[in-house]
Curated annotation (Swiss-Prot):
Native species: Phytoplasma australiense
Phylogenetic classification of the source organism: Bacteria, Bacillati, Mycoplasmatota, Mollicutes, Acholeplasmatales
CDD domains xrefs: Ribosomal_uS17 (cd00364)
GO biological process, one term: translation
Name recorded for this polypeptide: Small ribosomal subunit protein uS17
Presence of keyword ATP-binding: no
Function, in words: One of the primary rRNA binding proteins, it binds specifically to the 5'-end of 16S ribosomal RNA.
Alphabetized UniProt keyword annotations: Ribonucleoprotein, Ribosomal protein, RNA-binding, rRNA-binding
Quaternary assembly: Part of the 30S ribosomal subunit.
Family: Belongs to the universal ribosomal protein uS17 family.
One cellular-component annotation, GO: cytosolic small ribosomal subunit
The keyword RNA-binding belongs to this UniProt entry's keyword annotation: yes
GO molecular function, one term: structural constituent of ribosome
């Protein structure tokens, strides 16, 4: 797979408890087929962070790569901005 054809995403870090792995949540907006309203869906990805630079609340850019483990198929490109940890703790938690 060519490097330029790989998918890239922007998301917010919700967990950095694993070694060299972060959990990033990405919000995706889809249009409801019947009513036409935009509905927000979120999806979590496990992302490889070799230098362990990303912290909870950071906005990060990551890309698709070869499978690194059973659940990890993305790697961190760069940290776009630093956010507050308390914001993510409350808004990023799902049941």
């Amino acid at each position: 797979m060519k490097r330029n054809s790989r998918k890239t995403f922007v998301g917010k870090v919700v967990s950095d408890k694993m070694q060299k792995t972060i959990t990033v949540v990405v919000d995706i907006y889809k249009k409801d087929p019947l009513y036409g309203k935009r509905v927000r869906q979120s999806k979590k990805f496990h992302v490889h962070d070799e230098e362990q630079v990303a912290k909870i609340g950071n906005l990060v850019n990551f890309m698709e790569t070869r499978p690194l483990s059973k659940t990890k198929k993305f790697r961190l490109l760069k940290v776009l901005s630093h956010g507050k940890e308390s914001e993510v703790r409350h808004s990023g938690e799902t049941k």
